[in-house]
A protein has these predicted regions:
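Conserved N-terminal subdomain of the carbohydrate kinase-like
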Residues: 31-41, 56-143, 305
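Short beta-strands and strand-loop turn motifs
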Residues: 113-115, 140-146, 171-174, 195-198
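Glycine-rich phosphate/adenosyl-contacting loop at the front of the ribokinase-like
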Residues: 1-64, 71-82, 253
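Conserved phosphate-binding/catalytic region of the ribokinase-like
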Residues: 1-21, 162, 210-305, 311
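Glycine/threonine-rich flexible loop motifs
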Residues: 148-154, 205
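A short, aliphatic-rich alpha-helical micro-motif
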Residues: 2, 132-136, 188
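Short, conserved phosphate/pyrophosphate- and ester-handling motifs at nucleotide-, phospho-/glycolipid
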Residues: 54, 197, 263
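Conserved phosphate/ATP/ADP-binding segment of small-molecule kinases
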Residues: 157-169, 174-246
Length: 313
């Protein structure tokens, strides 16, 4: 099988409306009208964020997702195409509304989400099973979000196993607080990469120490690269059982504007590095550099992301 892609990003895609600034500590109905700096439409979800980061880093990238046959769906797909992302298997389906998120931000750049699941809620195992021929043409499949895919999570371990049998490596992204250890425990043996945030890992394991969280994932059968994203404290990685690497966070090249999509961008940078033959430490540093670029714009698609040089990484 000819390898056509470095990574296919599958799962949730949505249109994001970036709205702010708002006083998130004050009930919205206390003001009749809010004067805002921005109401900006862009694209979000792991499929949009990670695939755009990958494409801008020069990786051959495809998106595998589901949207409605509506204007927002057309907007979403056209944005990805403009970034050079292959959307040949990105479905628009009649009778569904494209998923959308209102990202409500305050003046300190903190945010909360108001999310309409829409088409993403209809994602089931057929999204992967019906496209295994396509996935077999890729080095990696990055799937997300665990915690927000109720129709696929009960059989997710079977889906990941089927992907690995094609020769494609697997990675899983999280959201929605991270979900629980079940059914993640069944999935970990079929993941080549799994790096949740510290908050997500705590929710999943009930533990507070990152090394203990990773040990819990290993106890569940994780054999690939496991780690914990720790924000400004960087990344704790375990490439193999018993080995730990601390990857420092990289200072953003300009002031932070919005942190939405930083975790997805980290995954994009990491997989971009691995697909071009970097060792895990160098690839993870590319991931942290990519995340640091992401936060300097209103969203991944609005950030002028260019490939960091070896010196910058």
């Amino acid at each position: 099988m000819t390898i056509e892609f470095d990574c296919i990003v599958a799962g949730i895609s949505c249109v994001d409306l970036l709205i702010g600034p708002l006083n998130l500590d004050q009930p919205l109905n206390q003001e009749g009208t809010w004067a805002l700096d921005t109401i900006t439409p862009t694209v979000g979800g792991n499929v949009s964020n990670s695939s755009i980061a990958l494409a801008r880093l020069g990786s051959r990238t495809a998106a595998l997702s589901l949207a409605g046959a509506d204007e927002w769906g057309g907007f979403l797909i056209s944005k990805l195409q403009d970034e050079g992302v292959n959307t040949s298997r990105f479905q628009q389906r009649d009778g569904l509304d494209t998923s959308a998120t209102a990202v409500l931000m305050n003046s300190k750049l903190e945010h909360i989400f108001a999310y309409k699941p829409g088409a993403s809620e209809a994602i089931d195992r057929s999204l992967i099973d019906d496209n295994l021929d396509f996935i077999a043409q890729s080095k990696y499949l990055l799937l997300g979000y665990y915690g927000l895919l109720p129709n696929i999570e009960p059989v997710l371990h079977e889906v990941l196993e089927a992907v690995q049998k094609t020769g494609c490596k697997t990675a899983l992204d999280c959201a929605g607080g991270g979900g629980g250890i079940t059914p993640l425990d069944k999935c970990l043996p079929y993941l080549d990469i799994y790096i949740p945030t510290e908050h997500e890992a705590e929710s999943q394991t009930g533990l507070r120490v990152p090394q203990d969280m990773i040990a819990k994932f290993r106890d569940c059968g994780a054999a690939g690269v496991v780690g914990v994203k720790r924000g400004e404290q960087g990344i704790l990685l375990s490439p193999i059982e018993g080995q730990f690497l601390t990857i420092a966070a990289i200072k953003p090249p300009s002031p932070v504007v919005n942190t939405t999509g930083a975790g997805d961008s980290f995954y994009g940078g990491l997989i971009s590095g691995l697909s071009r033959g970097m060792d895990i430490e160098s690839a993870a540093r590319l991931g942290t550099a990519t995340a640091s670029w992401c936060v300097t714009g209103m969203a991944v698609s609005y950030t002028h992301l260019t490939l960091p040089t070896n010196r910058e990484v």
